Amino acid sequence: MASSKGSQNHRNLGCNGKQALLPPKSPFTGGPTFSADFVPSSVIGSKAVQKLGEGNANHHRTSSESFLIEEQPSWLDDLLNEPETPVRKGGHRRSSSDSFAYVDVPVGFDVDYTLWDGGRYNNNNGFSNHVRGPKESDYLRSQPVPFYPSAHLSKQKIRPWDSLPDSGARPNSSSGCLESSSITRSGSSGSLRDTEKAYSAADSKKDFINNFAKSSFEKRDNPLAKSATSEADTKRARQQFAQRSRVRKIQYIAELERNVQMLQV
């Protein structure tokens, strides 16, 4: 009898040791483990929250389980107290973690419109982030906006003179060109003078070449002009030859006189 009691005590001690190593059992026997942080939006309601408190009354809960179930997070209370239709607020912006069920507009529409709206406000005010109010969002939902507004943005051309009043103060291209040319001329007067001198020299060369070509053509065309030029050339050649012959004669006479004087001495 003593040996049987000892073996039973030994077995009970082994079972108690194994149970101490095992994790605590879940309070819900009819399904997998459940946490209040992962409550889906479709199940949220007063009945679902009441079911969280129900369970096995005889089961002893640990301190961590009671803390998770009794102290619910603040966002869960807000979702439970929130009406079915969300109340729109002018300065409220939902974060990316909020569920899709509480947003009326599709995500793609909102993203595309924010891109288009940001570009519009960049041109006007210089701010890329723009928070839309309830009136503006309602008006935009009523208007048919395309899913890809980038094609329409590419067609828009921003012209600076469109923002000017209708008093006739529009820029003139000719006046702008004249002003720029006058500024450059006043700033570089020395270079303009040099270029004018170069142009005048080139013009004079062109005039000389044209006159020479005209005279040559006239001489070739007129036979009388040819004969006159030939006679003038012959006269000049004869005069030059006579002058040379006179010079030679004078030099020869001078040499002869020198030789006579040398012989007399």
UniProtKB/Swiss-Prot annotation:
Low complexity compositional bias, start-end: 180-191
Domain of life: Eukaryota
Cellular component, GO annotation: nucleus
Region (Disordered): 1-33, 158-197, 219-244
Bias type Polar residues, positions: 1-11, 170-179
GO MF terms, alphabetically ordered: DNA-binding transcription factor activity
Family matches, as InterPro entries: At4g06598-like (IPR044797), bZIP_RF2 (IPR044759)
Record's protein name: Uncharacterized protein At4g06598
Organism: Arabidopsis thaliana
